Amino acid sequence: MSIGILGKKLGMTQIYDEKGVLQPVTVIAAGPCTILQKKTEEKEKYTAYQLGFDDAKEKNTANAMKGHFKKVKSSPKRFIREFRANKDENLNVGDAVTVTRFAPGQMVDVIGISKGKGFQGVVRRYRFAGGGAAHGSKSHRRAGAIGMRAWPGRIWKNARMPGHMGDVKITIQNLPVVQVRESENILLLRGSVPGSNGSYLVVRPAIKKPALKK
């Protein structure tokens, strides 16, 4: 498994590919990221790298984290994530990880936090059909009956009901890389990714291969 990169969603736009087809793309400011910690089989029993992205003010950094950054001679970072890696990854603490790890046409997975929608009903949250819209109907957008019989005499857990929607971790798999702009530290991915503009993202090489079309 190869490590990925951390970034920030800038927004969406459209570009033409080499065939003249208009493609919707998401623009991501990816890296450069600093390797803050290296975990090894000998010490932690697995191989991984801890990456930091986006400089933060020292006054807004916890004292414990200040020591962590000072140990590796790095400025404080806002966004820190860990990537599992193969043993043959030859990276060291303090090295920079840039968009050059990716190439056009490569498939990637993107992990982010979805937009928060607040408290929503079942029609919007779970796409329920809703009740009748006629004059005699008294429940247009309600969930309907949720009761059980004498047994079990209760409501099953995880029943779909109104509640908080969004603001959860989402993984979008197998998005193709359209362009890699090394000088600007920009990745262009075809399609949409979770979160609002300015939200942090994790971009990693795709784990699952897309199914072949028959």
Task: Tell what function each PLM region has.
Residues 1-214:
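Extended basic (Lys/Arg/His-rich) segments that typically form rRNA-contacting surfaces
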